[in-house]
């Protein structure tokens, strides 16, 4: 029986369309996971070519032949022109703590600043609490207190300590949904503040998704300032993290000093049980072997330098190192003189903020795990002009295009950060 050539061609086209649709759905799903939190047209230069970003879609322009995108420095903060210069009053105090790592700290700082600003209260610098009882640090152990106070001086009064005459025991604890709005503060928090005089704020996370929504309206410029213009590492921690970035670039001389950061942590992978989502080629998270195959099929060379957020080397990572020998965890690239303080501490806060710093500044970021670390790292990368975020997937073919796996946060410009940068 003869074969109709038109039917064969039509069949091939149909299969191709389903594969493309599966990849698109996967990337959207990875960004839209609604997880519960712990405890409560511009041009982007490619290597030797360009990628055009139009109407939220990313595609290669003729002549594209590289995997490394150049930084995009076109975006600038919108909030300086939108902030009011009204004097900061001081009717009482707002206290809070930073918990669960830097990806949560950003949101917790933002919520506390918003509450203090719209209540006309004085904000007290937070302490930093780890996952274990009694695991506490001063804010200044990790972050630059003077930078935060200076950045907020015309918005919110910030003090380093609560006056002795004010007791924490008498403060009302107010749970605040992350991305809290002025309207919510007026309706739910202001009455408590007026009654008690001082409050303690605790953020909770109904979702770890940071997509901007049409229902959100304009992002409050105070929130933009707090999220992207106030929180920096203190000088010593910053210097250690930057030295590690430079060491990774030294290992990457053949690729112009470029390297990939992969958020891959064995303990989290074991807890999440990386199950399939029902969408072709998509999962909730990816192990070392799957990340290695993903990067190899995209065409990254075997001498590509890769940084992993995994705290210490684990035998399950060997497959990744077999394919990409220049794969490192932090103990291999941290200066020897700093390891006792930053790697042998009971608390993991130093390691967490270093991971966030390196992941935000790498030439490519690959989130093996969907969650708030991914979402806030993308936000920081947008602020720094580093849009190279590749969402992993199981590539059924022998190879794939990196531009097919750009995070929708970037390709569709639907991350909250795009409301804060023009």
Curated annotation (Swiss-Prot):
Residues annotated for substrate binding in this entry: 263-265
Residues that span the membrane, as ranges: 7-26
Domain of life: Eukaryota
EC nos: 2.4.1.-
GO process terms (BP): cell wall pectin biosynthetic process; fucose metabolic process; mannan metabolic process; mannosylation
Key words of the record: Carbohydrate metabolism, Cell wall biogenesis/degradation, Fucose metabolism, Glycosyltransferase, Golgi apparatus, Membrane, Signal-anchor, Transferase, Transmembrane, Transmembrane helix
Stored PANTHER family: O-FUCOSYLTRANSFERASE FAMILY PROTEIN, PROTEIN MANNAN SYNTHESIS-RELATED 1
Top-level class of the enzyme under EC nomenclature: transferase
Residue ranges annotated as Cytoplasmic topological domain: 1-6
GO MF terms held by the record: mannan synthase activity
Membrane topology, as annotated: Single-pass type II membrane protein
Identification of the protein by name: Protein MANNAN SYNTHESIS-RELATED 1
